[in-house]
Regions:
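Extended, charge-rich low-complexity interaction segments
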Residues: 30-32, 72, 76-90, 215-233
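Glycine-rich phosphate-binding/hydrolytic loop that grips phosphoryl groups
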Residues: 53-56, 177, 195-233
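Glycine-rich phosphate-binding loops at beta-strand->alpha-helix junctions
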Residues: 143, 165-195, 199-201
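Active-site neighborhood for divalent-cation/phosphate handling
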Residues: 1-62, 169, 199-205, 220-223
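Adenine-nucleotide phosphate-binding core of ATP-dependent small-molecule kinases
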Residues: 109, 113-114, 122-169, 176, ...
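Glycine-rich phosphate-binding loop plus the immediately following alpha-helix
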Residues: 27-56, 62, 93-133
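Gly/Thr-rich phosphate-binding beta-strand-loop-beta motif of the actin/hexokinase/Hsp70
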Residues: 16, 64-96, 103-106, 111-114
Length: 233
């Protein structure tokens, strides 16, 4: 088991006590991350926890929340390839995190099944387009509805385990959050203001950076951006 800790302040339970944040993970999980980085020719100095990385990024983008939206309770759904990380922040501090085994892979597999493609071909078709005319109605719309249901279920799990009965805003991140209309559908289904994350919205870009391409992929860069912000505040 990989374990780390940090003293985060005095405890209300007494002058001789402090609050300590303890993080633990299976060593195998950490080793897999490190091995992936090394395959890319890099060396890992720090392995962070996704929930805390997201916390860094939410602090960055919270200034862009719609006017009048409270920041007391913020939900985040980071929709990855094979899993969705659902987390909730209270007063800008992470208080809840849960992983759901649902993500973009489910959409890719449906494309593969429907059109007789390999998984790689289906993934490329999902990204680049060119699928048959019935794709949106037969595959994409049901996937969007299923995604909304998964996030709604995750939200109900949180409410059942917390004294908080509602969140003020839901932030969508990850590649699937860029699917046209998904934020609007989720907001309509759940009755919670829903936005798509763009951690680069207020950053100055170097001339060589393709601003359009960066904006397109920005929601999928939440984790990378949060890692880059580590230690900056």
């Amino acid at each position: 088991v990989a374990i780390d800790f940090e003293v985060i302040g005095d405890s209300e339970e007494g002058a001789d006590r402090v609050n300590v944040l303890l993080a633990a993970s299976r060593l195998e999980t950490v080793d897999n991350v490190v091995s992936s980085i090394e395959l890319g020719g890099l060396n890992a100095k720090i392995v962070d926890i996704e929930a805390f990385v997201i916390e860094n990024t939410i602090e960055l983008i919270s200034g862009d929340f719609p006017v009048g939206i409270s920041k007391d309770a913020i939900a985040v759904a980071d929709i990855g390839y094979s899993a969705t990380n659902f987390s909730v922040m209270e007063n800008m501090k992470m208080i809840y995190s849960r992983e759901e085994t649902f993500g973009g892979l489910q959409l890719t597999e449906e494309i593969q099944r429907k059109y007789g493609l390999t998984l790689e071909e289906a993934e490329l078709a999902k990204i680049n387009g060119g699928l048959p005319a019935d794709y949106e109605q037969e595959i994409l719309e049901p996937f969007k509805g299923n995604l909304a249901s998964q996030i709604g279920r995750a939200l109900q799990f949180f409410y059942a385990s917390s004294q908080i009965s509602s969140v003020d805003i839901l932030v969508l991140a990850g590649g699937c959050s860029s699917i046209s209309g998904v934020a609007e559908l989720i907001e309509s289904r759940l009755g919670v203001k829903t936005i798509i994350a763009n951690p680069f919205a207020n950053m100055a870009l170097a001339p060589k950076v393709n601003a359009e391409s960066l904006a397109k992929h920005a929601p999928a860069m939440m984790i990378a951006c949060g890692l880059a912000l580590r230690g900056s505040h």
